[in-house]
């Protein structure tokens, strides 16, 4: 019998004073590929709190991306419930989930998905045009250190700069939560540190709950809490009493 890790330890930065942002209870996800049954998640319980910087750590195939997609309303669990504040995402229809993603969640993926024919400013403005209370696109680009590159097209930007535009696009709608799936996976170490510093700044200055998926244990050193997955299960949850700044990381 497996005992689930305790999540009741005191938070070293006092970030658990408010209600949980996400509460996942007994999340199981099963995929069927022909006659093959793949269980990506197995009875996962996890609570995320406002203002945390959480790293989901584990090897490829451990269930990290599946969990992130379920939290973000991009996928649904086969069993279990997911709540965002007092909203039961598990019982929400497609329209409600679209509204949830639009109003509350910013996504950053390994690949930037910028529109090549639009400038950095115009790529960010795609989000600000539909958000409830958006930043100005220029303000979002300044937040990620790209104010002077606002009128450049993606082809004129480095990989790290393109990822920062993607982060600007994600934060321009002022999301409550920033969900990042291997945001440094396509970048070298030095460029990855720059990108992580941007996510760190968003978490610190805007109070945005940040969740970062990675297989890189070094990146976990900057988290306030580390959730380690293996084989579709959470095998460890640990507090980090002294998170390292992104600028101090190297791999």
Model-flagged regions — what are they?
Residues 1-30, 236-251:
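ABC-family P-loop ATPase nucleotide-binding domain
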Residues 20-229, 234:
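ABC family nucleotide-binding domain
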């Amino acid at each position: 019998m497996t005992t689930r890790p305790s999540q009741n330890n005191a938070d070293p930065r006092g970030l658990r004073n408010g209600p949980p942002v996400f509460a996942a209870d007994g999340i199981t996800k099963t995929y069927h590929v022909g006659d093959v049954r793949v269980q990506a998640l197995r009875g996962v319980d996890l609570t995320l709190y406002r203002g945390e910087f959480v790293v989901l750590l584990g090897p490829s195939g451990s269930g990290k991306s599946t969990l992130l997609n379920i939290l973000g309303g991009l996928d649904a669990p086969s069993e279990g419930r997911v709540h965002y504040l007092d909203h039961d995402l598990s019982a929400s229809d497609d329209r409600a989930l679209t509204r949830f993603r639009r109003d509350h969640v910013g996504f950053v993926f390994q690949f930037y998905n910028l529109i090549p024919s639009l400038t950095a400013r115009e790529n960010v403005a795609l989000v600000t045009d539909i958000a409830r209370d958006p930043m100005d696109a220029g303000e979002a680009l300044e937040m990620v250190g790209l104010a002077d590159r606002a009128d450049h097209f993606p082809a004129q930007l480095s990989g790290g700069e393109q990822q920062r535009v993607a982060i600007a696009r994600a934060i321009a709608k002022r999301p409550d939560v920033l969900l990042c799936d291997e945001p440094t996976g396509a970048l070298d170490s030095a460029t990855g540190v720059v990108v992580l510093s941007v996510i760190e700044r968003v978490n610190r200055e805007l109070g945005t709950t940040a969740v970062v998926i990675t297989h890189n244990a070094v990146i976990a050193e900057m988290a306030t809490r580390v959730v380690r997955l293996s084989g579709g299960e959470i095998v460890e949850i640990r507090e980090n009493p002294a998170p390292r700044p992104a600028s101090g990381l190297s791999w």
